[in-house]
Each structure stands twice: as C-alpha cells, then as structure tokens.
C-alpha cells in the first residue's frame, strides 16, 4: 500500500522507504510499490517515486498501479517519466482489490500498456499473436 491505506492506518512515503530499505538489507532486489485501491494520482506517484528512484537506483523498481478507464495514461506517463520501467498489468485490467471504493478501479490494462508503448518495450519472448489469443479468451470469459 505505497500510496495510502484503505484501513485508515498510518502511511507516508518515509514509511514506504523504510520498509524498502529493510527488505533490501535482507537481499530483496526488486520492488513493486503498489497502488492497491487506486488512490494514487499523478502527484502521489511523483511524491513517492522521486525519492524512491534516487535512493534505490541500484534496484529494480517497478509499479503496480490500479487505474480507472479514464486515468491509466496519466499514471503511466508520470511513473515512466520518473524512471519506472517495469509495470504490472492484467488483461482487460481484471483483478484488483475488493476494498476499492470505485468498482471501475482495476489493474493496469495490458492492452492499454501495449497500445501506449507499442511492442518495442516488451520482452523478446512476448508474442503479440499469443496475447491477442489470450485477449479473445478473456473477452469470452468476462464478456
């Protein structure tokens, strides 16, 4: 819960960085600060990732952002502009936290990520044909 806490418990950027440092001390090398219920806006992303990307520049730091259909691009723009190069995504944006107050909130949609960046940023092993097949399957399941 890197951008707020739906349980009304204490939260701040220093706390996130404190726990990232503790995890780094025991050998964790990859971090994915998470916007578990879609609280982050561009300013919150900037406030968190500006110090994180400086302090943890020797680590792989990504983003697990929950979005609504109208704000995924704003969040992706800000995180990418701050140096984030690894993003969690889900086909059709499915998944998310049941604590989110807005039922439109879900994971970053993989298809929007691909449309935004094109295939140039994807792993060499990524197959657009297999992804298209998975999209068709997801649409047949979820409607």
Model features per residue range: what roles?
Residues 1-143:
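Catalytic cores and adjacent flexible loops of soluble metabolic enzymes
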């Amino acid at each position: 819960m890197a951008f707020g806490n739906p349980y009304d418990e204490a939260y701040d950027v220093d706390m996130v960085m404190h726990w990232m440092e503790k995890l780094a001390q025991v050998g964790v090398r990859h971090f994915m600060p998470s916007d578990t219920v879609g609280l982050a806006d561009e300013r919150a992303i900037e406030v968190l990732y500006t110090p994180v990307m400086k302090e943890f520049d020797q680590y792989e730091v990504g983003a697990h952002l929950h979005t609504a259909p109208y704000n995924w691009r704003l969040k992706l723009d800000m995180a990418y502009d701050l140096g984030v190069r690894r993003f969690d995504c889900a086909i059709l944006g499915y998944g998310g936290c049941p604590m989110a107050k807005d039922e439109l909130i879900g994971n970053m949609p993989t298809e929007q990520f691909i449309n935004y960046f094109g295939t140039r940023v994807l792993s060499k092993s990524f197959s657009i044909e297999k992804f298209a097949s998975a999209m068709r399957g997801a649409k047949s399941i979820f409607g």
